[in-house]
């Protein structure tokens, strides 16, 4: 299952659950008062088809296959030329007359002469009505369709689509996440009946005094739309030997019934057509019955091939427990998943799908029928983790009506007896741990008026809530003259969306009619305002543009090759319908996209490039905002001055420091060689609060050769909310009154140490008088590869006094001592 769920409401099922005939304007009522209607159309495009009975037939002269058939269609007898091989006298057939439209051949019928004989219509095969042979039995595919009517219940001349289950309309509802109760015919019928009852009550004169019924009131209309449970259906049967054990709080209720003498065969045509119109493929009579109950009552059922099952245990899955589902998909479970077992091994993934080993087979003669209530949260978590949604899991996720389980269970057993020759040998085993309840909600007329914007009549409020099956726990003869008097309400079990006062207001508003709400102009002036994060992103773009960068906007989709280049050995997100093979994986680094642009530029001899992108990188569990920029060639061209600034690692680092200064954060650099597409001697991780948030470096020669690049420099920085929501603090240092003292220090140090490490030690151990330290010379002779020469320049100043020579000498001695201690330097 994918996309936004819909529910297809079929007229023939719906009208069985309504107290009154269907309204002609059901489309408008549903759209205005219940939910969006995505489609409203006849079940079948076939028209003017009637039931006829074959009286006799005879061969047409000069034809090998054609017969002239006399057919009684109730009001008259017609003669029809037919070439079917399965004609039988006395059988009832589908007759199309002149003007009939047949969906299967997409044609309107016209009477005509065939072999010189005038034909007054056509005897129809099911395929000509648009039913695929894939879902027909071999007998139904032989020729014209012959009704099976041993009790002569189908009237001649009547609409032939009725016994086929193809008459009436279909209403396709758009189901919002909060209205799981509309995922069944009976759930929609309850809401529609409430709308119809409310429409009728609005026409009557309203009374000022209200007698609120208690929760046992008999006038709550929707309760009459639910078929009644037959308490004697299982009464005379012995107790079942099948034991049920529930070991998890995620299972509220579990019912099973053993049925024997089962005959697995195709379902009757009306049932197959009903499922097809609901978007469900028929399988066999047992599975089709469970699917019919699913769409009619919204209660998922499951049938097991009982085999040697002597016990049912509902438990949490074991860590790393593996299962194979009906569609032969393998899944690995953990202790957060719920399974149905036979006491030893799993036979179903609770609420989602059955397993292959316990599935219904053509040879099955004994089944165990299951009806249960599982925690919506547990089912939703398992479906999301396994990425496996079914029609059953959808209803468990949205919430089923626990009160309907016994009724749906009994209806399924009745259908199995009728359509599968089943024999019920034992009473059902019913195990109920707990019953879900809705919260009690208190609200008053004043709250309703403030939320809706105008006052509603108390009588209307009472009628609408009672019609919707709300229980009103309020003293009798309450007139609500005081607008602050409390109404204590409880929504029916099927309504999982009613949890707070505003949810009740939502029901009252839609029953009033959102299309009738008076428009009101908001008088309060509004002023748009950027958040600190949005401001920083906007200003960061301006900063980079002012530094000479061009902004790029690239696709979030990249090729597998570019993904591996900058995010190797990581789980990735691959889209099902890619634009092309080069656009199939969601990037985890913006550098993947920028290197492609860089390659495009260099192939066209454009080497002086500087561009950036601020966009999202996509990981399995989150999205990260990232800034990436690239440099190549000359960063600054001075033309005739001939003082160009070439792109380099240090230019790139300087730009990054400009960015970090703008953001008000301090970045540290960690030398690394882990990034295979960066030069091993010129790459570093970027750290913020000791967490790696980016990378900077020079492109590897192999990457250059592969993508036709000249020497380039790359940098990427993940912009977390912590970074973007940092308020920049400006530190002011007064202009010094006294002269600055400068000292130089030159020394040899091992090549394994960097200036950054030396600078950190100097900052940590030197008095406040040192205001700046600069590296102004680096030298390494070919003969001393293990040593390098650094020349540092120190700037000393004190705001309160003129520094004496001995003060500066003391600082220099301390600096020298610490450098010898930590790095074993040799003073030159």
Swiss-Prot record:
Enzyme Commission numbers on file: 6.1.1.20
Cofactor needs: Mg(2+)
Metal-binding is among the record's keywords: yes
Subcellular location: Cytoplasm
Class of the enzyme per the UniProt entry, highest EC level: ligase
Keyword RNA-binding set for record: yes
The reaction(s) this protein catalyses: tRNA(Phe) + L-phenylalanine + ATP = L-phenylalanyl-tRNA(Phe) + AMP + diphosphate + H(+)
Cofactor note: Binds 2 magnesium ions per tetramer.
UniProt xrefs under InterPro entries: aa-tRNA-synth_II/BPL/LPL, B3/B4_tRNA-bd, DNA-bd_dom_put_sf, Fdx_antiC-bd, Fdx_antiC-bd_sf, NA-bd_OB-fold, Phe-tRNA-ligase_IIc_bsu, Phe-tRNA-ligase_IIc_bsu_bact
Principal location: cytoplasm
Record Gene3D superfamilies: 3.30.56.10, Bira Bifunctional Protein, Domain 2 (3.30.930.10), Ferrodoxin-fold anticodon-binding domain (3.30.70.380), Nucleic acid-binding proteins (2.40.50.140), Phenylalanyl-trna Synthetase, Chain B, domain 3 (3.50.40.10)
Annotated binding of Mg(2+), by residue: 497, 503, 507
Gene Ontology biological-process annotations: phenylalanyl-tRNA aminoacylation
A GO cellular-component term linked to this record: phenylalanine-tRNA ligase complex
Domain tRNA-binding: 43-161
Alphabetized GO MF terms: ATP binding; magnesium ion binding; phenylalanine-tRNA ligase activity; tRNA binding
Sequence segments annotated as region (Disordered): 203-230
PROSITE patterns: B5 (PS51483), FDX_ACB (PS51447), TRBD (PS50886)
Assembly and oligomerization: Tetramer of two alpha and two beta subunits.
Family statement drawn from the similarity comment of this UniProt entry: Belongs to the phenylalanyl-tRNA synthetase beta subunit family. Type 1 subfamily.
Record-linked HAMAP family: Phe_tRNA_synth_beta1
Protein name: Phenylalanine--tRNA ligase beta subunit
